[in-house]
Amino acid sequence: MKLHILAVGHKMPDWIATGFDEYAKRMPPELRIELREIKPEQRSSGRSAESVMASERQKIEAALPRNARIVALDERGKDWTTMQLANALPTWQQDGRDVAFLIGGADGLDPDLKARADMLLRVSSLTLPHAMVRVLLAEQLYRAWTITQNHPYHRV
């Protein structure tokens, strides 16, 4: 099973790529994290947020792995703990489908894409820099995996 992160946004600062890569490389081969950056739509004057999100939705849908479980990151999503994520990983692995985590652009994810998702997940109640989300998600996926392996990385 692969863990795909589809993130609207590109040309991130080097420290974002370094942070993401650090956690991605720690993952075992059977839970490899793959990042796909989606080029954001131009936010020209007169163009509505809905129009921008709809265009980004099409790009995300084109990049989605076939038959993947879709987890859309959204501020109104389920507020899971790290332990809940750790409990979900083995279940998802047994299911055999890849998991695609969707990170929207500046305006978020298109409502139709959120409706299509298998789950909406909130990363934090805090307002975070957009680029930081991919690093936090990669770290939490790594932490969740270490919990399933009784690895000492996670301490309570």
Swiss-Prot record:
Swiss-Prot/TrEMBL catalytic activity: pseudouridine(1915) in 23S rRNA + S-adenosyl-L-methionine = N(3)-methylpseudouridine(1915) in 23S rRNA + S-adenosyl-L-homocysteine + H(+)
PANTHER family associated with the record: METHYLTRANSFERASE, RIBOSOMAL RNA LARGE SUBUNIT METHYLTRANSFERASE H
Binding of S-adenosyl-L-methionine, residues: 73, 104, 123-128
CC annotations in GO: cytoplasm
EC class of the enzyme, as a word: transferase
Its EC number(s): 2.1.1.177
Record's keyword terms, sorted: Cytoplasm, Methyltransferase, rRNA processing, S-adenosyl-L-methionine, Transferase
Compartments where located: Cytoplasm
Function: Specifically methylates the pseudouridine at position 1915 (m3Psi1915) in 23S rRNA.
A molecular-function term among this protein's GO annotations: rRNA (pseudouridine-N3-)-methyltransferase activity
Main location: cytoplasm
Family: Belongs to the RNA methyltransferase RlmH family.
S-S pairs: none
Subunit structure: Homodimer.
Protein's recorded name: Ribosomal RNA large subunit methyltransferase H
